[in-house]
Amino acid sequence: MTLLVISPDYASHLYPLATLATAWQAEGERVVVATGAATDAVVRAFGYDREHLQLGRGSNPGVIRAEEQPPGEDDALRGFFDATRRGAVAALEFQARARGDDLLWNAVGVAREVQAIVERVQPDAVIVDHLAFGARLGLVGAQVPHADVVLGHPTALTVGDEVYGHPPTWPRAMRPADEELADLRVLCEGVRDTFTAQWNAALKDLRPSAQPSRDAFAETGDLLLLNYPAALHEPERTALLPPHTFLGSAVREEPRDAQVEAWLDADEGSVVYASLGSFPSARPDALALTAPA
């Protein structure tokens, strides 16, 4: 049996997908990962085979740096960093405006490459990152059964009257003004409609008889998997999801790091672990505020 895993060329996306695939590996099955060159070392470390697939312009092997991105993507990354300095709404607005170029980059080309990979690998099962829209177009276009994995918070898959990119809830301490949120929703609704039109145009190219989508951000695969604990998800929202399975957290084993072990052993005090993710970690000012706190 062969499992095909399709992931963007970002370590943060690949790690949980690769961890999920260890269940197949433990049974002696073959695992093939379709992703880019930047995360090749991650694929090899898990003991998997790799098929080359470029789902977007950017990549992140673990630590993201604008100067290591291709032309155009470097400026986009710097623009996003600048937007985070202006606040949460500014960051969300920046992401919304870049969404089509980001998530549907070279949509038909990516879709056809995915179809070619499926033809070469002949997988018995396929799991794909929910945000790999170009890859999912390829699978849907060729009617390849697949599991669609939502890696982040479940709101990455919109339900009900939610609009992608417009958080349905906010922490009280940082909730923006109602006017800002209203403007953000209008922007995100426009992006949703444009994105869905792009999705439908690509899908029609790939399979003319396919049913067009009303909201591409709400589309799911044959099996929906959520990398999130069911106990932490609002029951009202769970009731609106299509058939699904909550996976909990993708906990993986990693080799012990002697340098980290020595650092921890040198001080018997409590340790607070603050995980900001790749993008906020590129903000020295944010790190400087977090450390004293």
Identify the function of each model-found stretch:
Residues 6, 34, 53-56, 147-151, ...:
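Generic beta-sheet signal
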Residues 34, 38-91:
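Conserved nucleotide-sugar phosphate-binding/catalytic loop shared by glycosyltransferases and other
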Residues 63, 97-179, 231-232:
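Conserved nucleotide-sugar donor-interacting segment of glycosyltransferase catalytic cores
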Residues 69-133, 179-215:
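Conserved nucleotide-sugar donor-binding subdomain of glycosyltransferases
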